[in-house]
Regions:
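TerminUS-proximal long segments
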Residues: 106-134
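Small-residue-enriched alpha-helical segments and adjacent helix-cap loops
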Residues: 1-100, 111, 130
């Protein structure tokens, strides 16, 4: 039960951070005043795709973020598979463009995997470990 509560609190903190970014930090929605239902339905400008979810399925992105954000200084560790410890930790990106949309990455073909690995500068075998290839 405590793990479920911790997960919900982490997600709520991420959502609140996104709201503060929209209104006060980046200020692209300074007058936003949404109800709880509107927030739940994501009726705000921008999106917050999270690493490991359908629109950003490559869990290895966490290794890049770990270097950029200095995870150890935040008390966050990564497993060899890119999962975060403590479990109730979330990473993602914030996108402010008014027309951005969530989307799911479908089945990834071998040609796409090879091209993606080449663009990332890593081997296809390494990337395959972090993607659901089904």
């Amino acid at each position: 039960m405590s793990q479920i509560l911790a997960d919900r609190l982490a997600e709520a903190a991420a959502e609140r951070g996104h709201e503060l970014t929209r209104k006060y930090l980046w200020r692209y929605s300074p007058d936003e005043n949404l109800t709880s239902n509107e927030l739940f339905a994501e009726h705000y400008q921008g999106k917050r795709p999270a690493v490991g979810y359908p629109s950003l399925p490559d869990q290895s992105i966490n290794f890049i973020l770990a270097d950029l954000l200095d995870f150890p200084s935040l008390g966050v560790e990564l497993t060899e598979n890119g999962a975060m410890i403590p479990h109730s930790t979330t990473t993602g990106l914030m996108v402010s463009h008014p027309q951005c949309q969530h989307f799911s990455v479908g089945t990834i073909g071998e040609d796409q995997l090879t091209d993606y690995a080449l663009r990332r500068g890593v081997s296809a075998e390494w990337v395959r470990k972090f993607l659901d290839m089904s």
